């Protein structure tokens, strides 16, 4: 029996808070039962008594997303992660579509939770003010009535909230968490003073994240200004006449999309850069050799879902080599830049930090480094509108549209002035510093909630205010 977890329960205990009559051992793990007792001892309210739970809505039949960013944001599950809901990359819908699902809008200070799929249990708090913004059916809105939304957010992010979600989800291929289960979450009762302190931490985290985004945007603007592309409007004519020698004879492409005039407009501007430009194949070193993971060695594995909007790696899965997917074949090093090759996620680019040195990434990324352009400037270049458009132009395929190796290596990059590169690097480092500080404050709020539940609120308040405690390892 050594190594096995055994728990004997009375029939009445099995049925307690078990309206779906689950009898699988997974549901009665020791950790789940212990945490339930801790919360019961502290005192709690069921969610249904202090919050309103509302589902999202899928697009109505016959409606689709717009092909531009001028519409109404539609928050997806992937937009709800890393603490704050971000609609920067959300698809948009028309006003007509919105009117069909207007009952499913998000509002300021809503706490959003994903309830379907592998991302189930991701939590985000809405800190933007938009008149209209819709929510996917794969998430729910939690509207607080009697508690602070920041406290609710931090509790759900804590091990107590996440373990409840893990315990109560059902299904394997496509796990789900029912709204009824969410309404039965036991939320610990804490003082208004403690909730206010959590609110202060989360608000400070949001402010730092906003400054991080502004600093990142400053780096983007600096580059585009320097390249003369800040307010550039490419040609938008629907027809572009080409001879055979200037079309298929040169590119091997017959699809009309490839020959849109806007691509030529961006290309000419880059080629006119006074300090010159060179194709990626001569500016960068491409790391495309396959690495075969060792079966019994543990690796960090980075995939598309781990790339943030500010060019950062937000996390990685940890697993033995024998369990990794066949696409986990690229080994990355500190300061490498990884660039997605798949259309629809071409903007998923990131710098590899020290934390992910020697990690593996998907073969869906190109891994590059350069002696002519620093990593921070490479990142901003690859995420800039001109290079994004040229990457999109190079994409081909039917089932999985992506840019192949030759097309990628032929894209020209401007040899950005060294002084501008230094300024961009400084801005990106500032942005990263602020983002890490923001993440640390959210972690502190989460740990404080755990400490308040496991020990007492006084210890948690001391921890928040910087007094020493042995109960939590947060720096």
Placement of each model-derived feature along the sequence:
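Short coil/turn segments at secondary-structure boundaries
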Residues: 60-67, 167-169, 234-239, 293-301, ...
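A short glycine-rich beta-alpha junction/loop motif
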Residues: 132-140, 170-193, 345, 359-366, ...
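Short, surface-exposed loop/turn microsegments at beta-strand edges and helix-strand junctions
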Residues: 64-72, 84-92, 103-106, 124-136, ...
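A structural connector/turn signal
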Residues: 100-101, 172, 326-327, 355, ...
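Ordered, small/hydrophobic-rich secondary-structure cores
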Residues: 115, 123, 131, 136, ...
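Non-catalytic DNA-recognition/assembly elements of restriction-modification systems
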Residues: 1-59, 191-293, 418-475
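Sequence-specific dsDNA recognition surfaces
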Residues: 44-63, 78-108, 278-290, 305-334
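A short beta-sheet element
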Residues: 76, 102-104, 112-155, 338-382
């Amino acid at each position: 029996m050594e190594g096995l977890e055994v728990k004997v329960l009375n029939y009445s205990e099995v049925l307690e808070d078990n309206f779906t009559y689950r009898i699988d051992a997974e549901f009665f793990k020791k950790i789940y039962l212990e945490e339930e007792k801790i919360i019961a001892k502290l005192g709690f309210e069921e969610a249904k008594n202090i919050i309103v739970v509302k589902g999202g809505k899928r697009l109505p039949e016959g409606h689709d997303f717009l092909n531009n960013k001028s519409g109404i944001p539609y928050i997806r599950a992937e937009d709800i992660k890393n603490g704050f809901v971000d609609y920067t990359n959300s698809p948009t819908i028309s006003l007509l579509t919105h009117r069909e699902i207007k009952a499913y809008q998000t509002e300021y200070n809503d706490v959003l939770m994903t309830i379907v799929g592998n991302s189930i249990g991701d939590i985000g708090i809405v800190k933007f003010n938009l008149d209209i913004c819709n929510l996917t059916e794969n998430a729910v809105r939690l509207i607080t009535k009697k508690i602070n939304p920041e406290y609710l957010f931090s509790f759900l992010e804590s091990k107590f909230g996440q373990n409840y979600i893990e315990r109560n989800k059902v299904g394997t291929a496509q796990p789900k968490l029912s709204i009824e289960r969410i309404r039965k979450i036991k939320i610990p009762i804490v003082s208004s003073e403690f909730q206010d302190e959590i609110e202060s931490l989360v608000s400070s985290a949001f402010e730092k994240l906003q400054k991080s985004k502004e600093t990142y945007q400053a780096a983007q603007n600096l580059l585009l200004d320097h390249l003369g592309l800040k307010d550039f409007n490419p040609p938008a004519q629907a027809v572009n006449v080409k001879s055979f020698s200037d079309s298929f004879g040169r590119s091997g492409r017959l699809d009309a999309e490839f020959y849109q005039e806007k691509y030529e407009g961006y290309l000419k501007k880059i080629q006119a850069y006074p300090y010159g430009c060179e194709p990626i194949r001569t500016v960068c070193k491409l790391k495309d050799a396959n690495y075969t993971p060792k079966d019994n060695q543990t690796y960090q594995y980075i995939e598309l879902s781990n790339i943030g909007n500010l060019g950062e790696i937000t996390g990685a899965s940890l697993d033995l080599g024998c369990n990794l997917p066949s696409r986990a074949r690229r080994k990355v090093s500190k300061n490498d830049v990884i660039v997605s090759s798949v259309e629809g996620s071409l903007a998923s680019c990131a710098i590899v930090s020290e934390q992910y040195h020697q990690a593996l990434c998907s073969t869906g990324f190109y891994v590059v480094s350069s002696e002519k352009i620093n990593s921070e400037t490479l990142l901003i270049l690859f995420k800039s509108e001109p290079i994004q458009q040229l990457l999109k132009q190079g994409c081909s395929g039917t089932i999985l549209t992506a840019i192949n190796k030759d097309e990628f290596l032929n894209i020209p990059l401007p040899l950005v002035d060294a002084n501008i590169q230094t300024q961009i690097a400084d801005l990106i480092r500032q942005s990263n510093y602020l983002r890490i500080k923001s993440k640390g404050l959210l972690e502190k709020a989460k740990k404080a909630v755990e400490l308040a539940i496991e020990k007492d609120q006084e210890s948690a308040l001391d921890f928040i205010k910087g007094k020493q405690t042995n109960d939590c390892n947060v720096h």
